[in-house]
Amino acid sequence: MERKQGEVDHLERSRPLTDKERVMIQDSWAKVYQNCDDAGVAILVRLFVNFPSSKQYFSQFKHIEDAEELEKSSQLRKHARRVMNAINTLVESLDNSDKVSSVLNAVGKAHAIRHKVDPVYFKILSGVILEVLGEAYPQVMTAEVASAWTNLLAILCCSIKAVYEELGWPHLSNSTS
Protein backbone atom coordinates (compact mmCIF):
# COMPACT_ATOMS: atom_id res chain seq x y z
CA MET A 1 0.00 0.00 0.00
CA GLU A 2 1.26 3.46 -0.84
CA ARG A 3 1.97 5.79 2.01
CA LYS A 4 0.50 9.24 2.29
CA GLN A 5 2.57 12.23 1.27
CA GLY A 6 2.13 13.69 4.77
CA GLU A 7 4.74 11.21 5.97
CA VAL A 8 7.43 13.29 4.30
CA ASP A 9 6.18 16.78 5.27
CA HIS A 10 9.37 17.40 7.26
CA LEU A 11 11.03 17.68 3.85
CA GLU A 12 8.97 20.79 3.06
CA ARG A 13 11.00 23.07 5.33
CA SER A 14 14.70 23.64 4.94
CA ARG A 15 17.36 25.83 6.45
CA PRO A 16 21.00 26.29 5.46
CA LEU A 17 23.32 23.47 6.49
CA THR A 18 25.67 24.16 9.36
CA ASP A 19 29.36 23.34 9.01
CA LYS A 20 28.86 20.45 11.43
CA GLU A 21 26.00 19.07 9.31
CA ARG A 22 28.12 19.30 6.16
CA VAL A 23 30.89 17.28 7.79
CA MET A 24 28.45 14.68 9.16
CA ILE A 25 26.81 14.29 5.75
CA GLN A 26 30.13 13.99 3.93
CA ASP A 27 31.57 11.53 6.47
CA SER A 28 28.47 9.33 6.46
CA TRP A 29 28.19 9.48 2.67
CA ALA A 30 31.79 8.29 2.28
CA LYS A 31 30.77 5.06 4.02
CA VAL A 32 27.54 4.68 2.03
CA TYR A 33 29.19 5.44 -1.30
CA GLN A 34 31.63 2.56 -0.84
CA ASN A 35 28.59 0.37 -1.61
CA CYS A 36 26.83 2.80 -3.92
CA ASP A 37 25.48 0.21 -6.34
CA ASP A 38 23.84 -1.90 -3.63
CA ALA A 39 22.59 1.14 -1.73
CA GLY A 40 21.17 2.72 -4.88
CA VAL A 41 19.39 -0.46 -5.92
CA ALA A 42 17.98 -0.89 -2.40
CA ILE A 43 16.66 2.68 -2.47
CA LEU A 44 14.97 2.34 -5.86
CA VAL A 45 13.54 -1.10 -5.14
CA ARG A 46 12.06 0.22 -1.87
CA LEU A 47 10.66 3.22 -3.73
CA PHE A 48 9.00 1.08 -6.39
CA VAL A 49 7.68 -1.54 -3.96
CA ASN A 50 6.28 0.96 -1.43
CA PHE A 51 5.19 3.54 -4.01
CA PRO A 52 4.31 1.57 -7.17
CA SER A 53 2.95 4.68 -8.89
CA SER A 54 6.54 5.94 -9.09
CA LYS A 55 7.27 3.23 -11.68
CA GLN A 56 5.05 5.00 -14.23
CA TYR A 57 8.04 7.09 -15.33
CA PHE A 58 10.17 4.06 -16.22
CA SER A 59 8.97 2.18 -19.28
CA GLN A 60 11.86 -0.30 -18.99
CA PHE A 61 10.70 -1.79 -15.70
CA LYS A 62 7.32 -0.32 -14.80
CA HIS A 63 5.72 -3.71 -15.46
CA ILE A 64 7.99 -5.55 -13.00
CA GLU A 65 6.20 -6.26 -9.71
CA ASP A 66 8.60 -8.59 -7.93
CA ALA A 67 11.32 -6.94 -5.78
CA GLU A 68 13.90 -9.59 -6.72
CA GLU A 69 13.20 -9.06 -10.41
CA LEU A 70 13.54 -5.31 -9.94
CA GLU A 71 16.92 -5.83 -8.27
CA LYS A 72 18.13 -7.76 -11.31
CA SER A 73 16.96 -5.20 -13.88
CA SER A 74 19.96 -3.70 -15.66
CA GLN A 75 17.95 -0.55 -16.38
CA LEU A 76 17.09 -0.13 -12.71
CA ARG A 77 20.74 -0.67 -11.77
CA LYS A 78 21.80 2.00 -14.30
CA HIS A 79 19.31 4.49 -12.94
CA ALA A 80 20.31 3.66 -9.36
CA ARG A 81 23.91 4.45 -10.30
CA ARG A 82 22.82 7.80 -11.80
CA VAL A 83 20.89 8.67 -8.64
CA MET A 84 23.82 7.77 -6.41
CA ASN A 85 26.26 9.71 -8.59
CA ALA A 86 24.01 12.77 -8.47
CA ILE A 87 23.85 12.53 -4.67
CA ASN A 88 27.62 12.08 -4.61
CA THR A 89 28.13 15.23 -6.68
CA LEU A 90 25.79 17.09 -4.36
CA VAL A 91 27.54 15.88 -1.20
CA GLU A 92 31.01 16.59 -2.61
CA SER A 93 29.86 20.12 -3.49
CA LEU A 94 28.33 21.10 -0.16
CA ASP A 95 31.03 23.75 0.33
CA ASN A 96 30.14 25.34 -3.01
CA SER A 97 26.59 26.71 -3.03
CA ASP A 98 26.80 27.65 -6.73
CA LYS A 99 27.65 24.05 -7.65
CA VAL A 100 24.83 22.71 -5.43
CA SER A 101 22.38 25.10 -7.11
CA SER A 102 23.64 24.10 -10.54
CA VAL A 103 23.26 20.37 -9.82
CA LEU A 104 19.76 20.76 -8.37
CA ASN A 105 18.72 23.05 -11.22
CA ALA A 106 19.88 20.51 -13.82
CA VAL A 107 18.16 17.61 -12.03
CA GLY A 108 14.96 19.62 -11.62
CA LYS A 109 14.85 20.75 -15.24
CA ALA A 110 15.56 17.28 -16.62
CA HIS A 111 12.86 15.68 -14.50
CA ALA A 112 10.29 18.42 -15.20
CA ILE A 113 10.87 18.94 -18.91
CA ARG A 114 12.22 15.69 -20.32
CA HIS A 115 10.85 13.08 -17.92
CA LYS A 116 7.69 14.91 -16.75
CA VAL A 117 8.08 13.54 -13.21
CA ASP A 118 5.67 14.94 -10.65
CA PRO A 119 7.82 16.80 -8.10
CA VAL A 120 6.11 15.04 -5.19
CA TYR A 121 8.28 12.03 -6.04
CA PHE A 122 11.38 13.91 -4.91
CA LYS A 123 9.87 14.15 -1.42
CA ILE A 124 8.89 10.51 -1.53
CA LEU A 125 12.34 9.44 -2.75
CA SER A 126 13.97 11.55 -0.04
CA GLY A 127 11.95 9.77 2.62
CA VAL A 128 12.93 6.41 1.14
CA ILE A 129 16.61 7.42 1.10
CA LEU A 130 16.46 8.30 4.80
CA GLU A 131 14.68 5.05 5.61
CA VAL A 132 17.03 2.78 3.65
CA LEU A 133 20.22 4.47 4.85
CA GLY A 134 18.99 4.33 8.44
CA GLU A 135 18.33 0.60 8.15
CA ALA A 136 21.43 -0.31 6.13
CA TYR A 137 23.88 1.89 8.06
CA PRO A 138 22.57 2.15 11.65
CA GLN A 139 26.01 2.87 13.14
CA VAL A 140 26.55 5.70 10.65
CA MET A 141 23.04 7.15 10.58
CA THR A 142 22.73 8.28 14.18
CA ALA A 143 19.84 10.58 15.07
CA GLU A 144 22.09 13.61 14.64
CA VAL A 145 23.39 12.45 11.24
CA ALA A 146 19.87 11.55 10.10
CA SER A 147 18.74 15.04 11.08
CA ALA A 148 21.51 16.56 8.95
CA TRP A 149 20.49 14.34 6.02
CA THR A 150 16.85 15.33 6.52
CA ASN A 151 17.86 18.96 6.24
CA LEU A 152 19.94 18.32 3.10
CA LEU A 153 17.08 16.42 1.48
CA ALA A 154 14.68 19.22 2.45
CA ILE A 155 17.01 21.66 0.68
CA LEU A 156 16.98 19.33 -2.33
CA CYS A 157 13.17 19.14 -2.37
CA CYS A 158 12.68 22.88 -1.90
CA SER A 159 15.25 23.71 -4.59
CA ILE A 160 13.74 21.31 -7.09
CA LYS A 161 10.23 22.55 -6.30
CA ALA A 162 11.48 26.09 -7.04
CA VAL A 163 12.81 24.91 -10.42
CA TYR A 164 9.43 23.37 -11.21
CA GLU A 165 7.68 26.61 -10.19
CA GLU A 166 10.05 28.63 -12.36
CA LEU A 167 9.20 26.36 -15.29
CA GLY A 168 5.48 26.77 -14.62
CA TRP A 169 4.95 23.09 -13.88
CA PRO A 170 1.20 22.64 -14.48
CA HIS A 171 0.46 20.20 -11.67
CA LEU A 172 2.55 21.82 -8.95
CA SER A 173 -0.29 23.24 -6.90
CA ASN A 174 -1.89 19.78 -6.67
CA SER A 175 1.24 17.67 -6.16
CA THR A 176 3.31 19.32 -3.46
CA SER A 177 0.91 21.32 -1.38
Swiss-Prot record:
Write out the GO biological process terms.
Answer: nitric oxide catabolic process; oxygen transport; removal of superoxide radicals
Q: Which UniProt keywords apply?
A: Cytoplasm, Heme, Iron, Metal-binding, Nucleus, Oxidoreductase
Enzyme Commission numbers on file: 1.14.12.-, 1.7.-.-, 1.11.1.-, 1.15.1.1
Task: Kindly give the Gene3D superfamilies that the UniProt entry links to this protein.
Answer: Globins
Quote the InterPro entries the UniProt record gives. Answer: Globin, Globin-like_sf, Globin/Proto, Globin_lamprey/hagfish
Which SUPFAM superfamilies does the entry mention? Globin-like (SSF46458)
Q: Where is the Globin domain?
A: 16-165
Catalytic activity entry: Fe(II)-heme b-[protein] + nitric oxide + O2 = Fe(III)-heme b-[protein] + nitrate; Fe(III)-heme b-[protein] + nitric oxide + H2O = Fe(II)-heme b-[protein] + nitrite + 2 H(+); 2 superoxide + 2 H(+) = H2O2 + O2; H2O2 + AH2 = A + 2 H2O
Localization in the cell: Cytoplasm; Nucleus
Summarizing the function annotation, the protein's role is: Probable multifunctional globin with a hexacoordinated heme iron required for the catalysis of various reactions depending on redox condition of the cell as well as oxygen availability. Has a nitric oxide dioxygenase (NOD) activity and is most probably involved in cell-mediated and oxygen-dependent nitric oxide consumption. Under normoxic conditions functions as a nitric oxide dioxygenase (NOD) but under hypoxic conditions the globin may switch its function to that of a nitrite (NO2) reductase (NiR), generating nitric oxide.
Q: Into which family does the record put it?
A: Belongs to the globin family.
What does the record note on quaternary structure? Monomeric.
Name-wise, this protein is Cytoglobin-1
| Source species of the chain | Oryzias latipes
Q: What taxonomic lineage is listed for the species of origin?
A: Eukaryota, Metazoa, Chordata, Craniata, Vertebrata
